[in-house]
């Protein structure tokens, strides 16, 4: 790609209200584009042909809006990446993904998940929130800004991958070979802004994540097949063995008891603790209302709950399987058992270190026979300093969309993602903006987004690009 000489931008500023007005007029176009994308059942774990077709469509989208767009082939889904170099001094990178969660269970959908439907002021379809809707909104929002000013105030880069929902398995191949593309003056990860009056959160980083499968069985310690439970006092039970092993990982007060774990958890800085203290939402009330809880785990509330969710590591049994699970009864001693365990990591824990500590802990506790396998792609935690100017810029923009008192900046998000794959090869400031997701049914049937959120997102990304260009 030929890079033109850099020039300083001197265009005027378009007020947010004008950006929002233009965005609302563009809603029909946004819905049409989103409908075209929703019709692709682009599930990375299922149908490679549809994934490729969706990637081709995204590439064509970007080319149609004047971007120099390409595909990076991988052993899985292709990565679509695009640049619009206007010769500006600064560059903005936007990360999105075109793959989606499967539609299962289909019978719980009130409309076809692969056909966009608008009803009751909301747009329904798989991927409208995660993440095809935000991608369309960002693409159109930047186009609106370009047409308003005559020229974009920043160079814009889009990275749209196709494996986010399965752990970004091959994204590292792209980031390793395209460090120059990743360089920017600010990057946003799945930017998603709230509707006015609802809360908005800006994360300066994300937790790491590593997923293990633990197995008992398959050795002479256990029977080579399920056994009549009349022999229960004579035959080792793989299910009990695995349950006892898992019980050593945490105590009844929810403390992780893996030897050496706490020593690797970085102390919370004064700046980060101050941000947690200023968190504007009642997290406990929100969680209880959303999930029908009488109380949170251990009754945590206030700052204790906020710190535990956003700044603490976790060990979670995500699934357990053993023995007979069918209707009625079957009296057996199981010969095998397995569990899926999810570890969320904070600095300075890493997936490799977590695996090392877990295996050593099990051996020390007398469970060296438990087989430990790391599954899928693992991510290191990644964090931008909360004092970074780009973080401040994104917060200022978000505060114009929602009430300033409802906009919070948090040192890290509660989730995980491939941010560290970017930071590893081209250090840059990542801001992950997250809206109030209640009612969106993310990863569930009837995924939906308020129609007005499309225009809010368009105006928001235009405002971010405009402010970055003049900063």
Q: What role is predicted for each listed range?
A:
Residues 120-123, 128-300, 306-313, 447-457:
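Fold-level recognition of mixed alpha/beta catalytic cores in primary-metabolism enzymes, strongest
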Residues 354-362:
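Short amphipathic alpha-helices in soluble, non-transmembrane regions
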Residues 10-126, 147-154, 341:
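Acidic/His- and Gly-rich active-site-bordering loop/insert found
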Residues 381-400:
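Short, low-order "capping/linker" segments at domain edges
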Residues 348-354:
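Short, conserved charged micro-motifs
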Residues 299, 303-335, 342:
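A structural supersecondary motif
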Residues 22, 215, 222, 242, ...:
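Zn-dependent metallopeptidase/amidohydrolase metal-coordination segment
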Residues 39, 343-346, 371-387, 411-414, ...:
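A short beta-alpha structural unit
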């Amino acid at each position: 790609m030929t890079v033109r000489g850099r020039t300083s931008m001197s265009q005027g500023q378009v007020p947010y209200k004008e950006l929002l007005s233009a965005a609302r007029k563009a809603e029909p176009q946004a819905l049409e584009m989103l409908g075209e994308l929703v019709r692709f059942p682009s599930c990375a774990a299922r149908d490679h042909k549809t994934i490729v077709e969706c990637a081709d469509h995204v590439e064509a989208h970007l080319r149609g809006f004047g971007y120099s767009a390409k595909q990076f082939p991988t052993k899985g889904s292709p990565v679509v990446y695009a640049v619009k170099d206007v010769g500006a001094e600064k560059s903005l990178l936007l990360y999105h993904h075109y793959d989606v969660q499967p539609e299962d269970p289909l019978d719980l959908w009130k409309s076809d998940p692969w056909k966009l439907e608008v009803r009751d002021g909301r747009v329904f379809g798989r991927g409208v929130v995660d993440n095809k809707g935000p991608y369309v909104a960002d693409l159109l929002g930047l186009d609106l800004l370009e047409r308003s000013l005559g020229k974009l105030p920043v160079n814009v880069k889009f990275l749209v991958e196709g494996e986010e929902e399965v752990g970004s398995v091959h994204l590292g191949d792209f980031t390793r070979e395209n460090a120059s593309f990743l360089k920017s003056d600010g990057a946003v990860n799945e930017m998603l802004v709230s509707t006015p009056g609802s809360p908005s959160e800006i994360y300066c980083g994300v937790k790491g994540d590593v997923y293990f499968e633990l197995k008992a069985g398959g050795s002479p310690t256990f029977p080579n097949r399920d056994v009549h439970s009349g022999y229960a006092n004579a035959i080792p039970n793989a299910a009990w063995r695995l349950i006892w092993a898992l019980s050593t990982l945490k105590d009844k007060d929810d403390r992780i008891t893996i030897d050496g774990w706490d020593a690797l958890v970085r102390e919370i800085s004064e700046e980060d603790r101050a941000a947690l203290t200023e968190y504007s939402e009642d997290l406990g009330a929100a969680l209880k209302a959303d999930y029908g809880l009488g109380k949170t785990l251990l009754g945590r509330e206030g700052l204790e709950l906020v710190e535990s969710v956003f700044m603490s590591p976790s060990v979670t049994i995500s699934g357990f399987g053993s023995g007979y699970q069918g209707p009625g009864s079957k009296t057996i001693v199981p010969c095998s058992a397995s569990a899926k365990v999810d570890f969320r990591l904070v600095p300075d824990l890493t997936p490799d270190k977590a695996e090392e500590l877990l295996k050593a802990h099990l051996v020390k506790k007398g469970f060296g026979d438990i087989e430990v396998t790391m599954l899928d792609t693992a991510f290191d935690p990644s964090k931008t300093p909360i004092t970074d100017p780009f973080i401040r810029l994104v917060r200022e923009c978000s505060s114009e969309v929602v009430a300033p008192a409802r906009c919070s900046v948090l040192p890290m998000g509660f989730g995980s993602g491939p941010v560290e794959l970017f930071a590893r090869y081209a250090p840059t400031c990542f801001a992950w903006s997250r809206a109030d997701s209640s009612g969106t049914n993310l990863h569930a049937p009837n995924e939906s987004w308020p129609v007005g959120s499309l225009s809010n997102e368009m105006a928001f990304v235009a405002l971010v690009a405009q402010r970055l260009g003049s900063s």
